[in-house]
Amino acid sequence: MADEKPKEGVKTENNDHINLKVAGQDGSVVQFKIKRHTPLSKLMKAYCERQGLSMRQIRFRFDGQPINETDTPAQLEMEDEDTIDVFQQQTGGVY
């Protein structure tokens, strides 16, 4: 009984979730808690619903790189409290 495995399980559970910040161009920051192996599309859709935006209107980037809907925090080596940047999709060109 010396090996108390539930304690290990608790640690794993804590490490399984990650807190991410999503920073908009207007300076707003929205926090999300997501599992490391959950596709980021879930976070992206939740952010859009919360902000009243369409997925087609904005782009998500992490460390300057575009994020695909199928990417997971684990694949992108995200750590707790990392920030995802949101940019408005640029349309058109010269006035």
Curated annotation (Swiss-Prot):
Q: What is the effect of changing residue 35 to E?
A: Significantly impairs sumoylation of MTA1
What Gene Ontology terms describe where this protein resides (cellular component)? GABA-ergic synapse; glutamatergic synapse; hippocampal mossy fiber to CA3 synapse; nucleoplasm; nucleus; PML body; postsynaptic cytosol; presynaptic cytosol
**The entry's keywords:** Acetylation, Host-virus interaction, Isopeptide bond, Nucleus, Ubl conjugation, Ubl conjugation pathway
PTM characteristics: Polymeric chains can be formed through Lys-11 cross-linking. Polymeric SUMO2 chains undergo 'Lys-6'-, 'Lys-11'-, 'Lys-48'- and 'Lys-63'-linked polyubiquitination by RNF4. Cleavage of precursor form by SENP1 or SENP2 is necessary for function.
Please name one Pfam family that this protein belongs to: Rad60-SLD
Which SMART domains would you find in this protein's record? Answer: UBQ
Report the protein name in the record.
Answer: Small ubiquitin-related modifier 2
Q: Which organism is it from?
A: Homo sapiens
Gene this protein is translated from: SUMO2
